[in-house]
Structure formats: C-alpha cells, structure tokens
Amino acid sequence: MMLDQNEKIWESISKLAIKLANEAGFILYENFRKPLSVEFKDKSGLDPVTNIDIQIQKHIRNSIKSHFPEHGFLGEEETSATSQNKNTSEYLWVVDPIDGTKNFVAGLPIYACSIGVLYKGIPYMGAIFLPWPNSTKGSVIHATKGSGAYFNDEKILLCENSQEGKSSGLVTLPGSFTNIFNPSEILKNKIGDYRMTGSIAYEMAMSALGISQFMVSNAPSIWDIAAGTCIILESGGLVLEGVSERKRFRIFEEFKWKNLNSFNPNNESFEKVTASNLRKWQKPIIAGAPKIVNFTASNLRKR
C-alpha cells in the first residue's frame, strides 16, 4: 500500500523514536548498578541528575538533529537555551532521558526513558523504554496517532476490567495523593490496591498495558507524559487533565477534569506557543481505562 507524504513522515519519526528508545535502553542497562556521577538540580538535594541522563539526552538530541534538523527539541536536562521565549517548531521532540533517576541511582529497576513527539502541541507519537523481567535488553512500548499502540511488536488494546467503572485492581498514585486531592467517600472505598513507583512515564506504560487500571499524577511536567499520553490514547485509554477556571461573577476558581488533547497552554493557537511555555506546563492528570478514569474523575477534586 502506498503511503502519502504525511504517513511517510510519521513512519520515519516512529522508526527513529523506537530506535532511540532501544539505544537509550542499552546505555541504561550497561550502566545500571554501576558507579555514577550524580549532581543535584536543587539546593535541597531532592532532584538528582546523573552523567547517564546527560549522555542519553545528548545522544537522542544529536540523532534527531541529524535526521530531522528542522524539528524542535525539549529535554528535561536542557540548559536555559531551550527555554528561550521563541516560537517552537511544528514538530517537537519531548524527552526525559531517565524518568525515575532516583530509582536508577539506588539500583531499583523501575525507571523509563520517555520520547514523545508533538505536532503543533498535539501528542502524535510516543516511545518509552522499560526495563523488563526476563529480558536482556528491556522493552519499548510505542504508539503513533491513528496507528494503535504496541508493546515491542505486539499490538495492545486496553480492556475494561470493571464493568461498573470502579477499580478493583492495581492503581498508581503519588505519595502526596491525600494532601493534594480530596476523594469522595465512594472513591475511598473503590480506589483499588495502590502503588507508588517513582516514575510517571513507567506508570503511564503500566496503565496502557492494563497492569495498572489507572494512574494519577499531581503535577507532571510535559516530558513526563508527552509519550505516555499518546500511548494510552492509542491503546484505547483516556487521559484527563485537571484545570482551574475562574468563571464570571465567581470569586473562587472552579476545578474540573477535561480531556488532554493538546499541550498548548490555555488553549492558545500553536503560533503563540513558545518552548518556554511548554517547559512550564504542569497539570494534574488521570490516565487509564476509560470507565475507571471517568468514575475516578467524577469523585476526585483538588483540596
């Protein structure tokens, strides 16, 4: 079957993203539980960055520049040069070289390399490397908008495990869940068996695979969820973002959940979006099986 020009572009982007995720995985496996150079991005020593974070991001960025020189790049470990107040490219690669750096440093094999591609702010492609049991090279879960989601070469389709939309299986929640959110009494009794992993991208992959029925994150950055959002949507799942709006004649803001379809801030047109805007993106999200996500959202508010 002949592909049109747009399909050819996304096929090339997808192949490169999957290749880079696998290459990142090789670097991660080669350096796991090995001596690392660790620095901290904050004065409190809570936000580490390793030489492997920097190495992987540099490798990914250079490869993208070589294949798609006109594409934009936004990485977690970027310097201030990336955050300049300038319009971004229509195609923007959003990368977290190691999501779960604390786990990686500690020797806990729960981490991910997340590579997302946005088109005019819309999540169009995602590839996430995952360390995987009984695998010498790990696995990559990936998706392209309109083409479905895959775990390595196997197509995945998210199924509802609860006909009532109430979770009875595993869910992943942030440690600050009860401090940030106010669940209803109904939700408290039906929230499921919760876990905390320390990697948002990893949790989104688990939700796309149906291992976790849904996940909640209170303030992810764009590089944490750009890839996972596309993957969950293409697997048949749902991703909601929490927004606060001040309505006319109201003193207090109203919090509500809505579909996450674009990362463009405040629904602005793409032409007005800058790399600096996107770097500052942070909103709470719920993601996973649609019925459970909707049930959770209808019973969950911010404090």
Residue locations for each model-derived region?
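Short secondary-structure junctions
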Residues: 36-41, 149, 190-197, 239-240
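Residue-level detector of anion-binding/catalytic polar loops
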Residues: 70-72, 193, 213, 238
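Short helix-loop capping/hinge motifs at secondary-structure junctions, enriched
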Residues: 148-151, 155-158, 292-296
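DPxDG-like acidic metal-binding loop motif
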Residues: 86-150
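N-terminal subdomain of lithium-sensitive/metallo-dependent phosphomonoesterases centered on the IMPase/IPPase/PAP
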Residues: 1-98, 297-301
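Short loop->beta-strand "edge-of-pocket" segments that line small-molecule binding or catalytic clefts
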Residues: 157-180, 184-198
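Oxyanion/phosphate-interacting regions
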Residues: 1-19, 185-188, 202-303
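Residue-level signal for inorganic ion chemistry
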Residues: 28, 53, 64, 101, ...
